[in-house]
Amino acid sequence: KPKEDREWEKFKTKHITSQSVADFNCNRTMNDPAYTPDGQCKPINTFIHSTTGPVKEICRRATGRVNKSSTQQFTLTTCKNPIRCKYSQSNTTNFICITCRDNYPVHFVKTGKC
């Protein structure tokens, strides 16, 4: 697989969820081995409540490696500040800034415009 495909797969796993805000649970999700590869609790992670299409669309016509802002707002859940892997959870609706590599989202930069 090309590197972009692998990075996009990783991005989808780490940042895109089909769960509704009401059903989403930071503690359950963040304690999954996918988010704790070295056994450490990740300090913060933002999840985009969306299908993959609108997120990938942000990177359409993005050549090379570049940060791009979404043109639409997404529903987001941020899991942060774990104390013994118990997370605080906050929900918001906002634009997102992501790193694109050759038309694929590969890194979540921040909530809000770039």
UniProtKB/Swiss-Prot annotation:
Gene3D superfamilies: Ribonuclease A-like domain (3.10.130.10). It is found in: Secreted. GO terms for cellular component: extracellular region. It comes from the Eukaryota. Transmembrane segments: none annotated. The active site is at H15 (proton acceptor), H107 (proton donor). Glycans are attached at N27, N67, N91. InterPro entries: RNaseA (IPR001427), RNaseA-like_dom_sf (IPR036816), RNaseA_AS (IPR023411), RNaseA_domain (IPR023412). Substrate binds at K42, P43, I44, N45, T46. The keyword Hydrolase applies. The keyword Cell membrane does not apply. Keywords: Disulfide bond, Endonuclease, Glycoprotein, Hydrolase, Nuclease, Secreted. Disulfide bonds join C26-C79, C41-C85, C59-C100, C97-C114. SUPFAM superfamilies: RNase A-like. Monomer. Belongs to the pancreatic ribonuclease family. Endonuclease, hydrolyzes highly polymerized RNA, poly(U) and poly(C), and the dinucleotides CpA and UpA. Hydrolyzes 18S and 28S ribosomal RNA. More active towards rCA than rUA or rUG. Has cytotoxic activity against cultured human submaxillary gland carcinoma cells. This is Amphinase-2. It comes from Lithobates pipiens.
